[in-house]
């Protein structure tokens, strides 16, 4: 069974919690589908080429059909001409959206949490608030745990905690309503407030 490391007020290991056993039984393909969909949604879709209907000019036949000894041509804007259109090029009208239903999103998050717990990289504490709002104090939390980078999940994200963490390149802090399987997977460690963890497991 996957274990969640429980931290005390001094961020020292104080015990362990069990994740629901069904989390580890989730098919990892659900996690793959969600991550693929999430990354696809981030694509900017800026590459664009002009097709035959987009380029200007080329309405006049450049030379007569027969009698010149050369290849026939009906326009100077086909894809074989310099200054002509592009055949099968990328357009900014392409839609990269990939549908993932609510159940798959939920299963993906469960599997991502189970994977982190199996590696001993899922932590929980009563409070993760940084009341001072200082980056120095937020950095001390990460150093204390000895992790390379971390996702911080709060039950209710307050402004001071956000200010404290947002200037750290190796940290990302989110409200529990915004946490997803991709964020859990991409960080080496995940630290969740106990109340936030309860709300996640309750939904499942």
From Swiss-Prot:
Disulfide bonds: none annotated. GO terms for cellular component: ribonucleoprotein complex; ribosome. One of its GO terms (biological process) is translation. The keyword Acyltransferase does not apply. Pfam families: Ribosomal_L4. It comes from the Bacteria. One of its GO terms (molecular function) is rRNA binding. Keywords: Ribonucleoprotein, Ribosomal protein, RNA-binding, rRNA-binding. Signal peptide: none annotated. Gene3D superfamilies: 3.40.1370.10. Residues 49-75 are annotated as: Disordered. InterPro entries: Ribosomal_uL4, Ribosomal_uL4-like, Ribosomal_uL4_dom_sf. Part of the 50S ribosomal subunit. One of the primary rRNA binding proteins, this protein initially binds near the 5'-end of the 23S rRNA. It is important during the early stages of 50S assembly. It makes multiple contacts with different domains of the 23S rRNA in the assembled 50S subunit and ribosome. Forms part of the polypeptide exit tunnel. Belongs to the universal ribosomal protein uL4 family. This is Large ribosomal subunit protein uL4. It comes from Campylobacter jejuni subsp. jejuni serotype O:6 (strain 81116 / NCTC 11828).
């Amino acid at each position: 069974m996957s274990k969640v490391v429980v931290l005390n007020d001094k961020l020292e290991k104080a015990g362990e919690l069990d994740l629901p056993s069904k989390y580890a039984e989730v098919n990892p393909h659900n996690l793959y589908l969600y991550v693929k969909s999430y990354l696809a949604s981030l694509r900017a879709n800026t590459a664009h080429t002009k097709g035959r209907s987009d380029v200007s000019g080329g309405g006049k036949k450049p030379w007569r059909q027969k009698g010149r000894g050369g290849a026939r041509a009906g326009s100077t804007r086909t894809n074989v001409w310099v200054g002509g259109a592009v055949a099968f090029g990328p357009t900014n009208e392409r839609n990269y959206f990939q549908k993932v239903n609510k159940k798959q999103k939920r299963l993906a998050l469960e599997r991502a949490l189970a994977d982190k717990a199996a590696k001993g990289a899922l932590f929980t504490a009563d409070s993760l608030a940084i009341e001072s709002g200082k980056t120095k104090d937020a950095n001390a939390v990460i150093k204390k745990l000895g992790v390379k980078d971390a996702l911080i999940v709060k039950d209710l994200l307050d402004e001071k905690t956000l200010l404290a963490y947002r200037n750290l390149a190796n940290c990302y802090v989110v409200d529990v309503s915004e946490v997803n399987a991709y964020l859990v997977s991409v960080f080496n460690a995940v630290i969740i407030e106990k109340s936030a963890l309860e709300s996640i497991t309750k939904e499942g």
